[in-house]
């Protein structure tokens, strides 16, 4: 028999399912970010979580024959949620979906929004991979990006994440930043490589000046000193 080529129907028939869950809350908007996010009160967060739980229930019915092998909780800043809220979210997913025993469950974490206790609660809830938004080790570059942390704050979160039990950690860094040089980028990369233990993954992104962001407005005025 000739091997049958795979069509679109084969894709829909596969049994694995990957979930992306968006948490659209931030302390403040970074200068480069065009993702859906905004500040929120506790009431807003609770209302969003209630709506999210309802959507999970509805979506689960559509994929009752699938097994979840991967979950990515992104944003926004998911780590603005409490450990209890993340625990409730994971409980709801496990109640509604069939989960693979080795499912990778990633959550984005921003320094300045977590404590050692909160990280332990995330780990207990079932999060088994963290993606920490470092972006740069340089104070001026972080300031230009509108980030709320410094390198020391990142190092504290990284250390506390390891102490909480996380053994699978990704670190985000960015290139092409305002005021960045090859030397400063190399210094950032070397600092990441010298973390103990070294992160299991490093995601290196190049800055894209997106329409509608503060960086785009600065670029139009000729005020964005890109390398």
Residue ranges and their predicted role:
Residues 10-17, 37-61, 66-227:
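C-terminal scaffold of the Radical SAM
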Residues 1-12:
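Single conserved hydrophobic/aromatic residue that forms the stacking wall/gate
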